[in-house]
């Protein structure tokens, strides 16, 4: 018996009145991974396409793989470099013990890229697993109570949330963060398609304000004991970067040879995934370009104004793009179709506001050198208003046209 025939055979058990009716959400989620839903519209449709929401979400999920895989390698690379140079050692964490038990060695001249990748995987995969299991539990619970299908948007929420975290974050905080993002930022408003804030960023913001010591500072970015190292943005905010024309350092930041959150370090890897979802018309190029323009215009304005007391005024726009969460937020967070603006004209304003606010927070807020997370959440609140103004403008123009 084939898989499709087997699923069709057991389906009546999960439908209304069936033996396992309360588990319908789980059955539907599993079945539609392999096959499109069997339901049809009662009336004619405007667009007919074989793709559905699950396939769209899976494509976005797959688009994060370049940043994810490089991020795991970079975790190992950063730890290897500081241990090899002396003054640091393997951390007293079960992830490092697992790596050693698997036969891995790091911090040696003979250490290769595969060992670095394995070391990073020992840290990131548990984070992603906890995110998926805990967040998936809440998704299934709400779907079962409301008697509807499991929303596929969690495929994307889970991986985006995990990629914005440092490798050394405690797993119980990961569970709390994704719980806040799924339950408070999404499900209480009705679930996928009804939330007005980005769930992944809402969960990260909760962790930032509730447990700042484990998600910010200098000691969390490298998975090694006895080493503290600031991110590029933190160094710039402290006035430790005086020559922004260092091309070699910029390329290091672009390729991802720097410290940072797992999925935010390599602008090149992010660019590959971002261009894919733009090509597939899943992400809006207007929002991406708007974010880039907003950041470039405002940072250039601050460069012209200058400051004798704040070194961040001199930071060029092309450095803003490759440091912190700017690139990752621009491609994967700002383009969330639910919490972003919907109309084309509003997308430009929405994106521009994000880029402007990110640079504004980075430069003028000394307590928070990273600004993309707060900029996107702030713009989420403005997105409906931008759409409203565009809709009203279109209505007035059409009314004037018809007299």
UniProtKB/Swiss-Prot annotation:
Membrane topology, as annotated: Multi-pass membrane protein
In-chain residues carrying the UniProt-annotated modification FMN phosphoryl threonine: 231
Catalysed reactions listed for this entry: a ubiquinone + n Na(+)(in) + NADH + H(+) = a ubiquinol + n Na(+)(out) + NAD(+)
The species this protein was found in: Pseudoalteromonas atlantica (strain T6c / ATCC BAA-1087)
Protein name as catalogued: Na(+)-translocating NADH-quinone reductase subunit B
Annotated compartments: Cell inner membrane
Listed transmembrane segments: 56-76, 114-134, 165-185, 260-280, 287-307, 312-332, 348-368, 371-391
Keywords linked to the UniProt accession: Cell inner membrane, Cell membrane, Flavoprotein, FMN, Ion transport, Membrane, NAD, Phosphoprotein, Sodium, Sodium transport, Translocase, Transmembrane, Transmembrane helix, Transport, Ubiquinone
Keyword Phosphoprotein belongs to the record: yes
Matching HAMAP family: NqrB
